[in-house]
Amino acid sequence: VKYLIGKTHLIHSLDRFELADELQKRAEKAAWTADCLLEVNIGSELTKSGFSLDEALAAYEKMRAYPNIRMRGLMAMLPISDDSQYLRSLCLCMRKIYDIIKNEDPNAAYLSMGMSGDWRLCVECGSNMIRLGTSLFGARKYPVQTNG
């Protein structure tokens, strides 16, 4: 968090209250307001962080109470699946939550959902921000791990 203060336009991954507490503390000290998206773990995946679909509305409202955090919407990453109906249902759940939030919060401008492999479906379901790193820059190259 200490490296983000004053250097970001939008934090896409506000995924827990402990992070919000630390962000609030540092942003207040720097007289800065952090624009953030609430991260939602729409597939309930153990390998991803974020609030569950059931927690998202209450978490968003609680985050709005931090004076130096301005909530701007929601962010989610779809699970990897060949079941397009399942993925569409997750996207539509996110859209419903976003619509509720947008009606209550004039700052809620973004539904960030969709990456290089699934952005078309996400846009069809209402996403207005996509992340296309792999399409633009190629697949990530991870260092080879050795046991020695």
Please place each PLM-identified region on the residue numbering.
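C-terminal helical cap(s) of enzyme catalytic domains, especially alpha/beta-barrels
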Residues: 120-148
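Conserved alpha/beta-domain cores
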Residues: 1-117, 125, 137
